[in-house]
Structures are given as C-alpha cells and as structure tokens.
C-alpha cells in the first residue's frame, strides 16, 4: 500500500501551482493502469459474473476529454463577453463625443453601475489578461478628443475617394485637403467643417427678419458731415441683424484686421451701429401649491369674518298671482325602498314554503336533507308513506300571488267534523315555529284525494311541463357525450375489476409453461386462449425475461414471413430478481 500511495501522491494531493498539471503524463499512467486492470480478474458467483474495469477506465478518459472541451469553451466565452463590453463602451464614448463637440463630458456608462471596465491591458511576454475595476469615488480623467481634421486618415480611406485633375491625373485623395472634408445636412448641402453646423441656428433666426432693398452708397466724408456719421432716415429701414454668437470659433481682433486692410479712398459702406441685445426678463417661478394644506384642520385661511344676521322679507300676497308662466320645478326624488327593490331584484322566485327573501333560498335548499328527514319521521308515526320527490316538490314549489288559500274539505257529506284533528294544534304549538308552515303544506299534500279534480289536472300539467323542458334543452352534443359515456363505462368497469399487473408473476407463468431448460415453444402456444389484454401482459413479461437472459427470443427471417412466428427458448430457471436478493459481494481482502 505504501508503494501505491507514493506512486500516486501527485494525483491524490491538491496541486497549488496549476502549471504543474501539464508536467503529469496522464496517458502513460492511464495505460499502465489499464494493463493492470486487464490482467486483474474479479469474479462473482464462481466465475459467472466478471467485472470489467477496462471499460470503466475508458469511460472516465472520455468524460475527462469532454470536460476539458467544456472548460475551454467557457474560457473562450468569458473573453468574448469582455471584448463585447469593452467595444460597447468605446462606441458609446464615440457617440457622446460626436454629439457634444468640443465640450467636456464625463465617460459613458450608466449611473447605476458601481464599477466600470477598463481597457484590457495585455503584456507582450505574458499571455494573461489583467482586468482592473474602477473605484467610483476616484476623480475621472477627462481625455480631450482631437479635431477630426487633425486625425490622419488611413491608407485604405485615401484610396476610397481619389482626387483627379482635369487631365485625369491623380493628385491625391480628398482626405489630404482640409477644404474637401464636408458633411451632408438634411437639405442635401455640403457643409465644410463643423463651423457651419454652429451657424445653422443663426441662419434660421435671420430668415425671420424683414429684407429691404439696398440703399445707394454715399461718400464717407459727406455722410459723416450731413448726419453726424450716419444717415438716420436710411438706417431706419435698414435690416437689423442679431449678433453672432460665439460657438467655439476664433474671432480675429480689431488690430489684426486694421493691419491687413488696404488703404482705399473710394466709396465705402457706412458703418452699421451695434445692436444692443434685448435683455430677457427672468421668468417668475410659479408658486407651488400644497395639495394637503386644505386638509389641515388646524390651518387658518384668511381672516375670520364676523357673523351678520340676515334680514327676512315677507313676500306680498299678490306677487304669486301674476300672469307669468311658472317654470317646472325639479322632479321629486324617488322613494328609496322602491328604487332599491327594482335595482337589486333577483331572478330567484320566492318559494311558497321558503324564506321571506329569495336571496336566502340557497340556505333553505342546503338544509333540505334535514327537513326531509324530520318530516319522514313524523309521517311514519302517522302511518303515511310519501316519496322523497313529492316532499321535495312541496318545499320547492314557487309562490303564486294569484293563488288563494284553499279550504281543506272534510270527507263528511254533512260538513260536520267529528274527528280528533282539532287537538293536533296543541301538539303543533309545542314544536318550533319555523316548521308550522311546512307541516301545513305537507298535510295538504297528503290529502290529495280530498282535492278537487281541477286542482289535480293543474298539478299534472305542471309536472308534464317540467319534465318536457329536459328534452327541449337536450342537444346533439349532449347526446353524443351521453353515447360516449355509455360506450366507455363498461370498459372502465372491466379495468376496475381486472387484477393488478405483476410482471414477475407473469414471468413465472411463462417459465412454468416452458417447463425445462432448452425447451423451445412459440409465443402463440403460451398465450393460447387468453384475452387481448392478457396477451399484452404476457408479451411484456417475455421481453423482461429476454432482457434478463432467462429466455431467448427467435423468429423466422423475412418481413412478411416473420409475422406471428415469435418463439421462446428457456435458458435458465433461476430468475434475475431472485439472484439479486441472494447476491453477496466479495470483500476487498478476498480479491487476489
């Protein structure tokens, strides 16, 4: 054991330096280990079962290669993600610099990010990428972008737009000359440089001013002597131009202009007076209104006015008798009770023996079983038998306003009542009050023989209408559903009655049918006289036995000829699941 531990010590102990992994020759060591496993024999059950460790080692080697590929793919995806983030930040910085011009701006990035990626610094000698995270508290270094005209163009950009002379000679590229760098605006005009972009707003302002005809030129001396330096009348109709704003352009000083002006004594344009900029009045901020101020019970608004008593005037008697047409007064408010009953009237009808309010019918129906049970007991004591359907009809009978209370007629012809029913009220008084109406109704239904012929006809017609509604509401779809239920219910009942499927029990039946080892019989012989469901179960059990090498499956060659030619050959009578129950693995010390 000591030699084995010293031999594989570099594999058992964790490696602190990852570079030492490449010094290990896994291929040679794995080959030696496979040779040892090939010579090693581990058997169970007296040599019947053999353990093949060579296949296990090859499987481990293949899984190691797959794992190495996955690690390599993950390494590549990480660096692709970092490159994508870096390029995205660079594009965002370029877009921000082109829109803001020469103004100073902060580096791009969302405010919510706690940290940002710096550019990936890569050493020439080391093949590792170092990524440093920025501290948000450090001051940001603002890098000024050079003008576009000072950035040298690349060689392929120069060849893209060549500059040719009239003779067809190649003079250079459009990028070589400052005047040839232009941009296209919305109107399709060429704008030379960025200064024209700044003058775009000024040109739009100049269009709003009125344009006048040019005035004749005057000699500088005469104009100055006549009007003291400028003509007021002519200047009154002159065009007033707004001052040009400085958008980052360099304005030449007056001294430099005077030094380069050529002396001329000819006609000169009169000087235009400077236009004073109109001072803008500061906008007054609107007072913010506090929406909760009016809800403050302790706040005071204005001054408290003293209470003044009003004066009462008496209307003269003849004022209302004038001939003026009186206006129609406002409509009277509807009674709340009437409006409430119409608005919240339910579709449920009031039951004759039910609760006062139809909304409570569901409670009355839920307690129907208890009521029927009590009434059935009371009727048994009286010796009267009534079906449950008749009792339910008495409870669920709707109330009809036009019905009049019918007096129960006694069977005596003279109308004299000599029965003991007058004492029944004494027993009813001892019962709860909620059952009084129900008992009276049931008592009336029990004496249907005493009812008139007209009442019996009405009751029969009502029952016929209720039963006919069921057939009127029956549709083709409901009939199809009913037919399907009638056809499927016998099959479901048969499945419930059939015994549970035990694959081992059916396997024992097949082994018992084959009787001895080496006997070969057809599958049709085994399942002869069985139902289709039983044949399917025998088929599953036969496939399980073939998988356990208990039986061997044969068939005739050919597609058409092999139909219903399945044959089973018994290989062993010992079942696989029984062998697993009695299986005992040998100890490690017993291995040679």
Swiss-Prot record:
GO terms for biological process: meiotic chromosome condensation; mitotic sister chromatid separation. Its main location: nucleus. It comes from the Eukaryota. One of its GO terms (molecular function) is chromatin binding. Residues 89-116, 261-285 are annotated as: Disordered. It is found in: Nucleus. Keywords: DNA condensation, Nucleus. Transmembrane segments: none annotated. InterPro entries: CNDH2_C (IPR031737), H2_N (IPR009378), Ncaph2 (IPR031739). One of its GO terms (cellular component) is condensin complex. Residues 96-108 have a biased composition (Polar residues). Regulatory subunit of the condensin-2 complex, a complex that seems to provide chromosomes with an additional level of organization and rigidity and in establishing mitotic chromosome architecture. Belongs to the CND2 H2 (condensin-2 subunit 2) family. Component of the condensin-2 complex, which contains the smc2 and smc4 heterodimer, and three non SMC subunits, ncapg2, ncaph2 and ncapd3 that probably regulate the complex. This is Condensin-2 complex subunit H2. It comes from Danio rerio. The lineage of its organism: Eukaryota, Metazoa, Chordata, Craniata, Vertebrata.
């Amino acid at each position: 054991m000591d030699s084995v531990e010293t031999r594989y010590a570099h594999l058992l102990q964790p490696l602190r330096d990852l570079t030492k992994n490449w010094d290990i020759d896994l291929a040679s060591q794995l080959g030696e280990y496979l040779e040892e496993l090939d010579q090693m024999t581990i058997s169970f059950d007296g040599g019947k079962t053999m353990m093949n460790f060579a296949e296990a080692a090859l499987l481990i080697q293949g899984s190691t290669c797959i794992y190495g590929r996955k690690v390599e793919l993950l390494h590549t995806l990480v660096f692709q993600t970092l490159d994508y983030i870096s390029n995205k930040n660079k594009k965002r910085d370029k877009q921000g610099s082109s829109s803001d011009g020469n103004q100073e701006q902060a580096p791009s990035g969302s405010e919510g990010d706690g940290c940002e990626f710096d550019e990936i610094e890569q050493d020439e000698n080391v093949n590792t990428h170092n990524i440093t995270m920025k501290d948000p508290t450090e001051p940001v270094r603002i890098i000024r972008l050079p003008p576009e005209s000072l950035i040298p163009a690349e060689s392929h950009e120069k060849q893209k737009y060549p500059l040719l002379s009239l003779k067809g000679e190649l003079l250079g590229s459009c990028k070589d000359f400052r005047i040839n760098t232009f941009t296209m605006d919305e109107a399709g005009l060429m704008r030379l440089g960025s200064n024209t972009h700044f003058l775009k707003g000024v040109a739009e302002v100049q269009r709003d001013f009125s344009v006048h005809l040019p005035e004749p030129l005057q000699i500088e001396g005469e104009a100055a002597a006549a009007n003291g330096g400028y003509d007021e009348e002519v200047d009154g109709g002159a065009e007033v131009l707004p001052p040009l704003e400085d958008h980052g352009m360099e304005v030449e000083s007056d001294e430099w202009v005077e030094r380069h002006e050529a002396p001329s004594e000819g006609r000169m344009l009169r000087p235009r007076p400077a236009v004073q900029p109109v001072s803008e009045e500061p906008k007054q901020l609107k007072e913010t209104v506090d929406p909760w101020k009016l809800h403050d019970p302790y706040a005071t608004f204005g001054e408290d006015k003293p209470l003044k008593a009003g004066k009462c005037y008496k209307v003269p008697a003849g004022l209302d008798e004038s001939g003026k047409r009186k206006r129609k007064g406002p409509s009277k408010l509807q009674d709340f009770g009437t409006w409430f009953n119409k608005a919240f009237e339910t579709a449920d009808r009031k039951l004759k023996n039910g609760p006062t309010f139809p909304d409570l019918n569901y409670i009355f129906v839920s307690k129907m079983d208890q009521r029927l049970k009590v009434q059935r007991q009371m009727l048994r004591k009286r010796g009267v038998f009534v079906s449950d359907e008749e009792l339910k009809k008495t409870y669920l009978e709707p109330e009809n306003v036009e019905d009049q209370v019918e007096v129960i007629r006694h069977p005596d012809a003279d109308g004299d009542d000599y029965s003991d029913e007058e004492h029944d009220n004494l027993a009813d008084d001892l019962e709860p009050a909620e059952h009084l109406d129900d008992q009276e109704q049931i008592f009336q239904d029990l004496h249907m023989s005493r009812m008139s012929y007209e009442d019996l006809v009405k009751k029969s017609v009502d029952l016929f209408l209720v039963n006919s509604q069921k057939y009127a509401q029956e549709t083709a779809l409901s009939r199809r559903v009913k037919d399907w239920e009638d056809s499927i219910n016998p099959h479901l009942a048969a499945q419930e009655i059939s015994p549970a499927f035990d694959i081992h029990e059916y396997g024992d039946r097949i082994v018992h049918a084959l009787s001895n080892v080496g006997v070969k019989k057809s599958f049709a012989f085994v399942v002869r006289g069985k139902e289709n469901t039983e044949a399917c179960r025998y088929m599953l059990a036969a496939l399980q036995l073939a998988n356990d090498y208990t039986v061997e499956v044969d068939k005739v060659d050919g597609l058409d000829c092999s139909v219903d030619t399945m044959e089973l050959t018994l290989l062993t009578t010992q079942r696989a699941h029984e062998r697993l129950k009695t299986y005992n693995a040998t100890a490690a010390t017993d291995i040679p």
